[in-house]
Amino acid sequence: MTEKINLTMKFSLDKEKEEQARDIILTVFQALQEKGYNPTNQFVGYILSGDPTYITNHNDARSLIRKIERDELLEELLKSYLTNQ
C-alpha cells in the first residue's frame, strides 16, 4: 500500500486534444481581447474557480472553453509557457 503513495502519477494529453486545446485557447483569447477584457486575468479566474462567466459569450467563447477540462487547459498553457522560455 505504501508503495503506491511513493509513485508519481503521469498525466498527458493525446495530440488531438492538445491541438483542440490550443485552438480553443487562441479563439477564446481573441474573443476576450475583442471585448476589452484582460485575457490573462479572465483565464486565471476561470481556471481557479471553474466559473464560466469569466469567459465572454462573444464568438461562442464560453461554450468553446467548456469543451476542454480545466486541467487540460492549464497543461496546454504551462507547456506553451515553458517551451517559449
Swiss-Prot record:
InterPro entries: IreB (IPR009309)
Pfam families referenced in this protein's UniProt entry, alphabetically: IreB
Family as reported in the entry's similarity comment: Belongs to the UPF0297 family.
Protein's name according to its UniProt entry: UPF0297 protein Amet_2459
